[in-house]
A protein has these predicted regions:
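Iron-sulfur-associated redox domains of electron-transfer enzymes in respiratory
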Residues: 1-447
Length: 447
């Protein structure tokens, strides 16, 4: 039975009546019966009760103990069992460390890298390069969908797929009518897994299973995403990400260690090069798919150069709109929907055919990825709004880079993926979605 959460601090969530679905075959249903209870939609999505027993065991193993298990294994003399330990850090985690330790974001990245290497981590990467690929592939897919869209073939709106909580909810509850709109480009975490376990492994002459890959992320849903990452044939059955630790979990490890360790620059996938400067994509608290796809679509479809993307808040600050007008007509209408009240309204209108948007960046957390529950919470488990405001200010000051400007990404398309739009690029950078049949196994939420 669903262990319904009872958090009440998120005022942006709307509670809904949830009828009790039947269960079959004695297995855990995708969303267990809720005994006509009132639930928060965010709790429904973030709750771990819909995971299978096997997933539950695997999730429980993704913690600091698992991390230290590998570190300690590497200290033993049986070198055949040693692992190359790689940690990849999401850019939305860095403002948390900067705020936590009262450092600039560059200093925080160096402190984090130095601390991890002092423990025995071999390489520390930034996942921004993986987000480059995710955004570039999403840009191409949106343009294709826009050109193909018609009354007979409704390929729009395209909904982003970088947020694992939202994607799992779409797959498990909403089903095919909604998952057909999900962008097929893999999330930055999934791309990073392939970069580390495929490209980097070959550069180091290692088999994928010899690498233990840890992602540092702002939210707990990334742990579940790691379990669901499809294994590429090139990875020989190995998952791209072995363990996800939240920013808060890593901060605890740092606080328990020696804070006087020597700082170190973030590594890159390119030999001895180091990341001297922290950069991000153009998103208020996320990977910035909306802004980059909007600019690309404006240029590609309408030959319009958009330098500044102007957001307009509509019903609340977590639902914002961006439009492009040409000859007095709106030709592009994008939106960012954060938090479950806005997701709820979006799905309702989409099902009624009254949703006028071409593209929506969908994020489970109100305020975006910076507000992930793995970092923007008080010790008591409440939302830390003061910390969130501080992180937003820090994140806004990080220099923005456009994915098209990365020479390394273009190099990787050729060297690693055998060219842009190649069969290997499609296999490595795109995914498919598993949709449950609406019925006994779904939580039939009344929108």
């Amino acid at each position: 039975e669903c262990s319904k959460k009872t958090k009440t601090d998120d005022q942006d969530d709307l509670s809904v009546d949830a009828p009790s679905p039947a269960q079959e075959n004695g297995e855990k249903g995708e969303f267990h019966k809720l005994a006509d209870a009132k639930i928060f939609l965010s709790d429904c999505l973030a709750c771990d009760s819909c995971v299978t027993a096997e997933e539950g065991v695997q999730l429980s193993q993704q913690n600091a103990k698992d991390f230290f298990r590998v570190l300690n294994l590497n200290k033993k003399c049986d070198t055949s069992k040693h692992k190359v330990l790689v940690v990849s850090v999401c850019p939305q985690s860095l403002p948390y460390f900067a705020a936590k330790f009262n450092l600039s974001v560059t200093e925080a990245s160096r402190r984090l890298c130095g601390s991890l290497k002092s423990l025995g981590v071999h390489f520390v990467f930034d996942t921004t390069i993986a987000a480059d690929f995710s955004i570039l592939e999403s840009q191409k897919e949106f343009v294709r969908r826009y050109r193909q869209h018609s009354e007979e073939e409704r390929t729009l709106p395209m909904l982003t797929s970088a947020c694992p909580g939202w994607v799992r909810y779409a797959e498990r509850v909403l089903g095919r009518p909604i998952t057909a709109h999900l962008c097929t480009a893999k999330s930055p975490q999934q791309v990073m897994g392939s970069l580390v376990k495929d490209y980097f492994a070959r550069q180091q002459n290692l088999s994928p299973e010899k690498i233990f890959h840890v992602i540092v992320a702002p939210c707990y849903d990334k742990k579940l995403e790691a379990l669901q990452e499809g294994s590429l044939s090139a990875l020989h059955g190995s998952r791209g990400t072995d363990c996800v630790l939240t920013s808060g979990e890593i901060a605890q490890i740092m606080e328990q260690g020696d804070l006087s360790v020597k700082d170190a620059a973030i590594d890159t996938l390119f030999g001895d090069l180091r990341e001297d400067k922290v950069t991000r994509h153009d998103g208020a608290g996320s990977d910035g798919h909306l802004a980059h796809i909007f600019r690309h679509a404006a240029k590609e479809l309408f030959n319009e150069d958009v330098e500044e993307v102007t957001y307009r808040a509509l019903r609340n600050k977590d639902f914002q709109e961006v439009t492009l007008e040409k000859d007095g007509e709106v030709v592009l209408r994008f939106a960012a929907a954060c938090g479950f009240r806005n997701i709820q309204n979006m799905i309702l209108k989409l099902k009624k055919g009254k949703f006028p948007y071409h593209f929506v960046e969908v994020l489970a957390c109100a305020g975006g990825c910076l507000n992930g529950r793995g970092q923007a919470q008080t010790p008591e488990g409440h939302a830390d709004k003061a910390l969130l405001r501080q992180m937003e200010g820090i994140y806004a000051d990080i220099p923005v880079r456009r994915p098209e400007s990365s020479a390394h990404v273009q190099e990787l398309y050729q060297e690693w993926l055998e060219g842009i739009n190649s069969p290997k690029a499609r296999e490595v950078l795109h995914t498919t979605y598993q949709s449950q049949e609406r019925g006994a196994h779904s939580l039939d939420i009344k929108w």
